From Swiss-Prot:
Alphabetically ordered keywords of this record: Cell outer membrane, Cell shape, Lipoprotein, Membrane, Palmitate, Peptidoglycan synthesis, Signal
Location in the cell: Cell outer membrane
Record-linked PANTHER family: PENICILLIN-BINDING PROTEIN ACTIVATOR LPOB
Cross-referenced NCBIfam families: lp
Annotated lipid attachment (N-palmitoyl cysteine): C21
Protein's GO biological process: peptidoglycan biosynthetic process; regulation of cell shape
Name of the molecule in the record: Penicillin-binding protein activator LpoB
Complex formation: Interacts with PBP1b.
């Protein structure tokens, strides 16, 4: 019996020994890795965000500086003449000239400007036609007939015939027996008016006159 107790005590002691080993094994903490200096990865540098450069503002260009035209010529002076005062006495003398057949057709050519300046020859021509209106001796070629005859020569109604030969040619075309050819000559400030009455058939000068024209 003592032998059995000893065996039981030995088994019990061995069991206690094993349980203590197991307990120590279970209580050991898990190994912890220590951080070693110098092994950390370097931080990646932050890439700069690219920026778009701003476009500089272009300043508004000033407009061209306007200068008054220094080369422009002054407007020509407008002159007014007493055409009627010069023409009435001359027309009266022409109507009394020798060799003029009453009732004949008369072509009044435009007054030609032969002065050294600019004057309104159209105004002079109109005044001359008015001075001859209802003269009792000549029948005037109408302005419409004269305009048509000028157009046949390639001229405008306002154009002067410019020469005696052209005036005579148109007079024949319109059936006129006489032509009154007139020129303004000399200084434009104090022009002279020359008038010639010509016979279309022969070109003979039946009458001529000259008078001074004053400015108004």
């Amino acid at each position: 019996m003592i032998k059995n107790l000893s065996r039981y005590a030995l088994v019990t002691a061995f069991a206690l020994f094993l349980s203590g080993c197991i307990t120590r094994t279970e209580q050991q903490p898990a190994p912890v890795d220590e951080a070693k200096p110098g092994t950390e990865q370097p931080a990646q540098p932050t890439q700069p965000v690219p920026t778009v450069p701003s476009v500089p503002t272009v300043p508004a260009q000033p407009g061209p500086i306007e200068h008054p035209d220094q080369t422009s010529q002054p407007a020509p002076r407008v002159r007014h003449y007493d055409w009627n005062g010069a023409m009435q006495p001359m027309v009266g003398k022409m109507l009394q000239a020798q060799g003029v057949t009453a009732g004949s057709v008369l072509l009044v050519d435009s007054v030609n400007n032969r002065t050294n300046g600019t004057l309104n020859a159209g105004e002079a021509t109109e005044t001359l036609r008015n001075a001859l209106a209802n003269n009792g001796k000549f029948t005037l070629v109408s302005a419409q007939q004269l305009a048509v005859a000028k157009q046949q020569l390639g001229l405008s109604p306002q154009d002067s015939l410019g020469s005696r030969s052209k005036a005579m040619g148109i007079a024949r075309n319109v059936g006129a027996q006489y032509v009154l050819y007139s020129n303004a000559t000399g200084n434009v400030n104090t022009p002279a008016l020359q008038m010639q009455l010509m016979l279309v058939q022969t070109g003979e000068i039946i009458w001529s006159g000259k008078g001074a024209v004053s400015q108004q």
